[in-house]
Structures are given as structure tokens and as C-alpha cells.
């Protein structure tokens, strides 16, 4: 009888690998590709990824984006930590393709992404402005993603306002900062757009916030104030939490952020990335300083953790390199597979024969590439499996000794 590893154990072992390693393993053979694209494996991998969310950092340089991810701090007793990160993947907008956008000569446009948790749909809200004012007399547009048809629909907004970029979507409602002008003058407000019903509302506020975040399921506005001396600390963090949407009723909280390290300095260049599932408010640098600092502040404990991230591959000259951080990043292969299927679906739906686009030489070259990858990866994959098996066996022995 042929000895083989149970498929459940294979799923268990490979789900512990990084996403990049899993993607490479898919190139080994058709059998491996079938295993690693199976629904059982993708769901198991997503479960493990949700248990270990990461911080995603996007680096923008010369029209090219690089994305890297680092672990989010787990040990709350550590006041500081150091991690080294290299780019997981790159993307570049080709210089041969130009983007044309028709807007008013003296205005601009704003677009926001929202999610409807009931129908599980993503929608894009697009607004053209004149002198940066979104008029109630002008059409706004909605694009529903994932339907297989990219078609904009017109909708109306009941009030004229001046939108800004601070935005967040919470429980199917898209919030963004704005100004509202009437006979009494100019006032601050939060525009509320229900993603499912596609209806607008607004909430009057006394401030414009540096950033909007999801604070335990509630809308929260945050402002930062820096110390005037060199170093920037302490940093005053003010929070306004929307406790009741109907009234509306806000609660204010003020904290003083400081670090004992004299090396860590900020120069009015912090951005609020969001709030993690564990309750930490994450602040990060807006530019690619060396080192790149990430701050994790827990309002309940009033503690601040400093994470120093060494970003590799940027070179010595880091001027004009922007950074954007996103919290609770998880890797999901089911989304990646859906994107690949969506990319290939238009030609298939039109019934076009794409076989003529590839010559026999290209096909042979692809086969050679697969064979090369298979030969190159077989060794590393085998080592990865052996390592995972050893790790599982070691944990089993430790537990066995502990029980005895």
C-alpha cells in the first residue's frame, strides 16, 4: 500500500506558511495547485490569517507602489520592538497609459469606497465639484463592484457641501468630513451615506478632524497636537466618539502620548492609521524615514508601544517617499482567486477565442518555466514541510511531557 500524508494534515501544515510561499507552491504541479486552491484550505488559511493580523505599509515612490507587511505587536509588556521588512509585492502604473478625467476647470473630484454588510457589496461614491463644492443640483455617481458590469448610476444629494478626504465606513454607513455653508455662515459636518439605500444624511460637528476611525463600532474623530520643542513629544491626542447617532451625542477623551526614548522623534508627520481589533490606535509616519516608526496606543491602558520598522530596498535618498499604513491586514486567497477569475471573465463571456494570442513557442516557454519552478521549489517546499512536521512533533512532545 502506498504511504501518503493525510490531506487534513497537509492542509494543517501548509496553512502555517506565508502567503508568498503558498503562491509559489501552487506552481509545483497540478496536484499542488488543486490542493492549495481547495475551499477547505483557503478557509483554513483565512482563519489562521485572521488570528495573526498584520500591519500593511504602502510605499509610494516615483509612481510605483511597494507593499510590505509586518506583525502587529502582541506582547503588551514590551515598550518597543524592532522589525525588518522587505516589500511583499510591487505595482506600477505604466507610463504608456494615461488617465483622462473630465472635471470642472476650477474644481476637482472625490471618490469614496463603502461596503454594504447585508448584501456583501462594495460601492464607489463619486462626486464632481465646482470650486471644490459638491452641489445638490449636480449628479453624483455610484459604481457597484463585483457585479461583472462596470456601470455608473446617477444619484442625488439633498444638500450642497464641500467634501474632504477624511473618511471611514462603519456598519454600512460611509462617513466623510465636509463643510456646509448657509445664511448663518460656514459650519463643520460629517456627511453620512448609507451604502445600501444610497441615501445621504449629515451630522453637525464643532471641529474638523485629522482622521476618522472605527472606535469599537462607533465613529470617532481624532486630532493631534505636537509639543513645540524638538522631538515633538508629548503628543496630545484628542478623541471625539459618537455615542448616539440620533441625538447626536459625542464624548471627548484627551490623552498625552510620550516615550522615554530620546531617539524617537516626530516632526508633525504622524498619521492615524486606524484602530486594531485588540483596541490599539495605530499612528505611523507619513514619510519613509529611517527608521520608520509605528506607535500603538491603547486608550484603556493608557500605554504606548513604539515599533521601529526597517524598510529595505529604498536606498539612502528617501526624500519625497510617502508611506501609508493600514491596520489588521489579513491574507485571503479566496479574494485573490476571485480577482483572477474576474480578470479573465470578459473575454470568456464574449465568446472570443484567445488561443491565437499565444503562439506555440510561448506555450512551450510557459511549460519550461513551470518545470523550472517545480524543480527549484520542490527542495524548498520539502524543507518547509519537514520543518512544520518537526514543529508539530516538538509541540506534541512538550505537551506529552507536561501532562506526565
From Swiss-Prot:
Coiled-coil parts of chain: none
Record Gene3D superfamilies: 1.20.1280.50
Pfam families (UniProt xref): F-box, FBA_3
Location (main, coarse): membrane
GO cellular component: membrane
Subcellular location per the Swiss-Prot or TrEMBL entry: Membrane
Residues in F-box domain copies: 1-44
Membrane topology: Single-pass membrane protein
UniProt name for this protein: F-box only protein 12
Organism taxonomic ancestry: Eukaryota, Viridiplantae, Streptophyta, Embryophyta, Tracheophyta
Gene: FBX12
Amino acid at each position: 500500500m502506498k504511504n501518503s500524508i493525510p490531506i487534513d494534515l497537509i492542509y494543517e501544515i501548509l496553512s502555517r506558511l506565508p502567503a508568498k510561499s503558498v503562491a509559489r507552491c501552487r506552481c509545483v504541479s497540478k496536484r499542488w495547485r488543486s490542493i492549495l486552491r481547495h475551499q477547505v484550505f483557503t478557509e483554513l488559511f483565512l482563519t489562521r490569517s485572521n488570528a495573526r493580523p498584520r500591519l500593511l505599509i504602502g510605499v509610494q515612490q516615483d509612481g510605483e507602489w511597494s507593499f510590505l507587511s509586518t506583525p502587529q505587536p502582541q506582547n503588551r509588556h514590551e515598550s518597543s520592538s524592532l522589525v525588518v521588512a522587505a516589500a511583499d509585492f510591487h505595482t506600477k502604473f505604466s507610463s504608456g497609459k494615461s488617465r483622462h478625467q473630465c472635471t470642472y476647470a476650477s474644481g476637482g473630484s472625490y471618490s469614496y469606497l463603502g461596503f454594504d454588510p447585508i448584501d456583501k457589496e462594495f460601492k464607489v461614491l463619486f462626486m464632481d465639484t465646482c470650486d471644490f463644492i459638491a452641489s445638490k443640483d449636480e449628479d453624483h455617481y455610484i459604481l457597484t463592484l463585483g457585479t461583472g458590469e462596470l456601470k455608473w448610476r446617477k444619484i442625488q444629494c439633498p444638500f450642497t457641501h464641500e467634501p474632504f478626504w477624511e473618511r471611514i465606513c462603519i456598519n454600512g454607513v460611509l462617513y466623510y468630513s465636509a463643510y456646509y455653508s448657509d445664511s448663518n455662515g460656514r459650519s463643520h459636518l460629517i456627511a453620512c451615506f448609507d451604502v445600501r439605500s444610497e441615501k445621504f444624511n449629515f451630522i453637525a460637528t464643532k471641529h474638523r478632524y485629522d482622521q476618522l476611525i472605527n472606535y469599537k463600532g462607533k465613529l470617532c474623530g481624532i486630532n493631534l497636537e505636537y509639543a513645540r520643542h524638538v522631538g515633538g513629544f508629548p503628543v496630545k491626542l484628542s478623541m471625539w466618539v459618537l455615542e448616539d447617532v440620533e441625538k447626536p451625542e459625542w464624548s471627548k477623551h484627551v490623552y498625552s502620548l510620550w516615550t522615554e526614548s530620546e531617539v524617537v522623534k516626530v516632526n508633525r508627520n504622524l498619521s492615524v492609521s486606524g484602530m486594531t481589533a485588540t483596541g490599539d490606535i495605530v499612528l505611523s509616519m507619513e514619510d519613509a524615514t529611517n527608521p520608520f516608526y509605528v506607535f500603538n496606543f491603547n486608550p484603556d491602558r493608557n500605554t504606548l508601544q513604539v515599533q521601529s520598522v526597517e524598510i529595505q530596498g529604498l536606498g539612502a535618498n528617501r526624500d519625497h517617499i510617502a508611506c501609508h499604513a493600514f491596520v489588521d491586514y489579513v491574507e485571503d486567497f479566496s479574494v485573490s482567486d476571485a480577482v483572477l477569475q474576474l480578470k479573465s471573465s470578459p473575454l470568456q463571456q464574449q465568446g472570443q477565442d484567445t488561443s491565437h494570442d499565444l503562439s506555440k513557442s510561448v506555450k512551450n516557454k510557459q511549460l519550461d518555466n513551470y518545470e523550472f519552478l517545480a524543480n527549484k521549489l520542490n527542495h524548498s517546499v520539502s524543507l518547509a514541510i519537514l520543518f512544520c512536521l518537526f514543529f508539530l512533533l516538538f509541540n506534541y512532545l512538550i505537551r506529552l511531557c507536561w501532562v506526565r
